[in-house]
UniProtKB/Swiss-Prot annotation:
Protein name: Phosphopantetheine adenylyltransferase
Pathway(s) where this gene product acts: Cofactor biosynthesis; coenzyme A biosynthesis; CoA from (R)-pantothenate: step 4/5
Organism: Oceanobacillus iheyensis (strain DSM 14371 / CIP 107618 / JCM 11309 / KCTC 3954 / HTE831)
Cofactor: Mg(2+)
Keyword terms, alphabetized: ATP-binding, Coenzyme A biosynthesis, Cytoplasm, Magnesium, Nucleotide-binding, Nucleotidyltransferase, Transferase
Residues annotated to bind ATP: S10, F11, H18, G89, L90, R91, E99, Y124, S125, F126, L127, S128, S129, S130
CDD domains found in the cross-reference section: PPAT
One GO location term (cellular component): cytoplasm
Length: 161
């Protein structure tokens, strides 16, 4: 497929499910920019700067992936970066309805940029950042659910180090 894709999200924090989608996107596109966007409907645990650092630590082994952040509309950001596509991960059918609404609006804003949906691997179909934060908050075992830098950061955030 080639070219440039944007992989947007709040990544609060990045999970192994996110990492799965990012890695697979990097196998399809020449370049992937993982972009941290603030979701106004969520109260983040990690600052944008912390999320960028965690992403960079988690994806440094993938040479064609970089990390950025934006507070603009996704389609404006994608146009500015000259992206050809947006990669969105889906865990289950329930994600599709929400993502379809966003995609329809994004098409209205810029019909030249395609949205590609990737189903996460089955082992991550239950995984969400919210769930990981809840488990970590009560000192539960999150190994295998998040990259190692995230596991350490969550333990530090909840004072379990």
């Amino acid at each position: 497929m080639g070219k440039l894709a944007i992989c947007p999200g709040s990544f609060d924090p990045i999970t192994n499910g996110h990492l799965d989608i990012i890695q697979r996107g990097a196998n399809v596109f020449e370049e992937v920019i993982v972009t941290v966007f603030n979701n106004q409907s969520k109260s983040p645990l990690f600052s944008v700067t912390e999320r960028i650092e965690l992403l960079e630590d988690s994806i440094k082994h993938i040479p064609n992936v970089s990390v950025d952040s934006s507070s603009r509309l996704l389609m404006d950001y994608a146009r500015e970066k000259k992206a050809h596509a947006v990669i969105r991960g889906l865990r289950a059918v329930s994600d599709f309805e929400y993502e379809m609404q966003i995609t329809s609006m994004n098409r209205k804003l810029n019909e030249d940029i395609e949205t590609l949906f990737m189903m996460t691997n089955n082992q991550y179909s239950f995984l969400s950042s919210s769930m990981v934060k809840e488990i970590a908050k009560y000192d539960g075992n999150i190994s295998g659910l998040v990259p190692e830098p995230v596991e350490k950061a969550l333990k530090a955030k909840f004072n379990y180090l």
